From Swiss-Prot:
Protein species of origin: Archaeoglobus fulgidus (strain ATCC 49558 / DSM 4304 / JCM 9628 / NBRC 100126 / VC-16)
Membrane topology (UniProt): Multi-pass membrane protein
Source organism, top-level taxon: Archaea
Keyword Membrane carried by entry: yes
Recorded GO CC terms: plasma membrane
Protein name per the record: Uncharacterized protein AF_1499
Record key words, sorted: Cell membrane, Membrane, Transmembrane, Transmembrane helix
Species lineage: Archaea, Methanobacteriati, Methanobacteriota, Archaeoglobi, Archaeoglobales
Cell compartment(s), UniProt: Cell membrane
Transmembrane segments: 5-23, 38-60, 73-92, 127-149, 170-192, 197-217
Amino acid sequence: MAALLFYISAIFVPEAIWLLWSFPHWETMHVWNSLSEIPTAYVTAFISGDALLAVIGFWVAAKLIRSGRDYAAHIQWIAGYFAFFFVLAHGWDGTGWQRFTWDPTVTGMPWEPGRTMWVDFATSNVAITLYAMALPTIVPMIAGGYIWLRNGHILAGLDGARASSLAVKGVAIYLLGVFVAFLMAACATVISLHLTTQAGMLVGVIVTITVAYALAFRRGGILQTAISRGFNLT
């Protein structure tokens, strides 16, 4: 918990504040165009929510592991990434990907439905800032995850070499889980956008989760097997 709180307070939350301060339009998905427009309560909830959700996630995962439901604890973080990517890709009205790929500091124009920079966003001010933040965000998380997993396997009675091998596999499977969550979000978004009914978003999410469960998450599924072996679950 101490390591998590340090990571959140020293890296994650400061980065979120930086993005909100430098790109308030992009960080709020273009709901507001400047800091002066954003309600103070929203900023407070945004900053505290970043830390609170991480702590709640840690607490829930710990409760699941202590009750012997290790696999459910892993499903939780995959579900979190799915929700994260789905918000970016779909948003609340199907335009999330357009909002994400629009940087008013480059275009000089506020976002409107239908506007997107497409591949030009990759060289935008927002994108360059995200690239700069990637190293201090991802490296400590990957390195910390490896150390945490290795120490955990050693405490469970495994020798150092076996513990290190499983820790590497665990990190690789974590990255695989993130990628699967991204694919699920993309599929849910595509399905939702092809449905014209008001329930399109819900249908897209349900269909995606159902297919993902059948292919990957059920007992004996691809991801379930990988998680069980990679994290040495019994």
